[in-house]
Amino acid sequence: MSLFKARDWWSTVLGEKEEFDQGCLCLADVDNSGNGHDKIIVGSFMGYLRIFSPHSVKAGGGPQAEDLLLEVHLRDPVLQVEVGKFVSGTEMLHLAVLHSRKLCVYSVSGTLGNVEHGNQYQIKLMYEHHLQRTACNMTYGPFGGVKGRDLICIQSLDGMLMVFEQESYAFGRFLPGFLLPGPLAYSPRTDSFITVSSCRQVESYKYQVLAFATDADKKQEMEQQKLGSGKRLVVDWTLNIGEQALDICIFPLNQSASSVFVLGERNFFCLKDNGQIRFMKKLGYNPSCFLPYCSVSEGTINTLIGNHNHMLHIYQDVTLKWATQLPHVPVAVRVGCFHDLKGVIVTLSDDGHLQCSYLGTDPSLFQAPKVESRELNYDELDVELKELQKIIKDVKLQGVWPLTEQEDDLKVSASVSSTLDSVSQATNVEPGADSVPSITVKITLQNRVVLQKVKLSIYVQPPLQLTCDQFTFDFTVPDMTSSVAFSVYLKRNYTPSELEGNAVVSYSRPTDRNPDGIPRVVQCKFRLPLKLICLPGQPSKTASHKLTIDTNKSPVSLLGLFPDFANPSDDDQVNVMGFRLLGGARVTLLASRTSQRYRIQSEQFEDLWLITNELILRLQEHFEKQGTKDFSCSFSGCVPLQEYFELIDHHFELRINGKKLEELLSERAVQFRAIQRRLLTRFRDKTPAPLQHLDTLLDGTYKQVIALADAIEENQDRLLQSFSGLKSATHLLILLIRLWQRLSADQTAILEAAFLPLQEDTQELGWEETVDAAIAYLLKTCLSKSSKEQALNLSSQLNIPKDTSRLKKHITLLCDRLAKGGRLCVSTDAAAPQAMVVPGGCTPIPESDLEERSLDDSTELFTNHKHLMTEPPMPEVSARQGVLE
């Protein structure tokens, strides 16, 4: 806000509920009085044309009636008014009024009055042009270097420039690549038209090029210019300013140079005649209008810029010289001379506030009213203060919105069918030996109040597929209940990383102050059964990957834990069970009779995750039903980092292959386009010439492009499958670390946030660099051992790494720090060095040795610790025996 406001010299309000824009204001000696005094010409969208000759307003008075010289209703909306030499045979000034479908040129004349009411003014129509296209704006000037007269150029809404040589129509040209009209100005020194296109670039067109270009009475003829006579319309120069322009002004510096001023949405540009930037000013506000004018200082330019904050800024080049406050938002600003008072600033608002003002030091003072003094009752103030503090404390505990109120607005519940669909809803699945089942999920929504824009979105982990994942609801009255049902099935022949789905409901709750509603989100999770992606199978005697989970309770019959996978013919096999995933992998689960342990084994490491997680969940549910509260699971084996690193390397290799294929495809595409251009040149040549096997080269390149595109698509499919397996292995690794170190729920959440940051894996932002940055941050903060490690600078950019050695080293170091008693936390004191407490019976690992070890030996570190000693070998059992000794 400026300290000084514009000093009001004369002001008035035009009409009632009329609208105005930047082209509706013009200052000139329109009646050719010869005294050098300007008149204010204002046109409105309601069709009114007014001409004012303002006089100084006495203190306490308002504008006089004689200030309004003329007011006439033209019936059609007035888009723009200009004054120039528009009539042939005379150099007198005339008024041009642009309507949407008509251009009218008037002469304004005054008759001296014989009475005290003043002079009488009238306008006379000299000529008019009916336009075939809807006009947008216009400009005028001595086009082509003519002397003593001005020509008019009108820009239509569809991009046609129509040139009128006073009483006659000259020609029309369409601007190339036109989309939306922009501001238009004429530069007399270069004899060119300057505009800003929809491509957000300033474009200059020579008048001579426009005049000699092919005539364009129809827009379709622009495509036929190559076949007809005449020249193509080409641009003289362009400059990309990166934003839309509000207005353009041409200001002559001297006889040999002029400047092009462009007012953008956020910047103010001054350009040379050839399109080079003379200077640019970044604006910290939203401008509404501007006007360059001659500066008192030699070689500088002053510019008035109005904005939507009721301010008018005066710049000398790029330096702010003055800021003044206006009573309205100006949409047009001019500088004129009235009755020997030069430099009067005339502003017009969009609702018709017309003001003539000048700059001065008239401060806008505000005097606060006196406050009635009264005696204070400190006892009552103490009681009120305690009540307010209690309210603030309650709000802090509940959050910005009370949780109970959020839950009461909309209740969302999900129920999964206990049985598979009798008729599978699976469609477009990959061919396989097994029939793909589906299961129905029902989502129920119940609202308490009226809600708007209610949208339900469901998400499941790929390759699980939904028959429908988007639903909309109309809760126009309170206490409505709506339900939707959909089916879930496995679309691809590999295993998902999770069986948990998420239903998210977004809605808006209208209030008295906000009828559009306050946006809110409610979500509900549901768990799909294991039998959706798994079938009963034969137990396997041997497997490449094995895990053993310890418990503190007696072993439970697997037939009781997994009744939906029990085989009636094998009732005696209560301690062994086989699973066959729909992707083809087999998993075997064994229970020991005496050692309170369970073993899970499979040929693929990532396939162990779902069965292991399902086993722990069903064991917890089993003992909860029995009322046992102290049940717990643990893991005392080796952390399988080597198997995990193999999956990381496979996923990273697919990412590198995808990047190489994309680069190769880009090269082949460039080659393909180059061959096309060569062929096109040969075909256009009037003299036939041999193709020199360009057609064969084009066909071969096309086949290479198609083959590379197919290879990229195949690699993306393999990458999706690899990422799903990597997420499964990551879930399993987090589970084993949690059981191994007995991590709390908060610590497990930190691990999940570090290892599983992405739902989707892309070339721009991949899993490896994201996880590496997260683990490096944990090692630097809560798991750091010294201040030296805290001083390490982490990379601010996430780029695809050259290899996975750094990531694997960080994961190994993370497990080692946890083994030494490191604590995961993200509080403010997390950066403090943690005291590494080594558990009893554990041999510490020297940090220097850890850093120097090779990658091949890094995963064997944990086998040297006593708390990670290899479990005693379990005797192999047959699938029929199923008993662990």
Curated annotation (Swiss-Prot):
UniProtKB keywords: Cell membrane, Cell projection, Cilium, Cilium biogenesis/degradation, Cytoplasm, Cytoskeleton, Membrane, Protein transport, Transport
GO CC entries: BBSome; centriolar satellite; ciliary basal body; ciliary membrane; ciliary transition zone; cilium; cytosol; membrane
Keyword Transport appears in the UniProt entry: yes
InterPro entries recorded: PHTB1_GAE_dom, PHTB1_N_dom, PTHB1, PTHB1_CtH_dom, PTHB1_hp_dom, PTHB1_pf_dom
Chain intervals for the UniProt region annotation (Interaction with LZTL1): 684-764
Disulphide bridges, residue numbers: none
Site (Critical for protein stability) residue list: G141
Keyword Electron transport among UniProt keywords: no
Region ranges (Seven-bladed beta-propeller): 1-406
Localization of this protein: Cell projection, Cilium membrane; Cytoplasm; Cytoplasm, Cytoskeleton, Microtubule organizing center, Centrosome, Centriolar satellite
GO biological process, one term: protein transport
Biological role: The BBSome complex is thought to function as a coat complex required for sorting of specific membrane proteins to the primary cilia. The BBSome complex is required for ciliogenesis but is dispensable for centriolar satellite function. This ciliogenic function is mediated in part by the Rab8 GDP/GTP exchange factor, which localizes to the basal body and contacts the BBSome. Rab8(GTP) enters the primary cilium and promotes extension of the ciliary membrane.
Assembly and binders: Part of BBSome complex, that contains BBS1, BBS2, BBS4, BBS5, BBS7, BBS8/TTC8, BBS9 and BBIP10. Interacts with LZTL1; the interaction mediates the association of LZTL1 with the BBsome complex and regulates BBSome ciliary trafficking.
Name this protein carries in UniProt: Protein PTHB1
Organism encoding this protein: Mus musculus (Mouse)
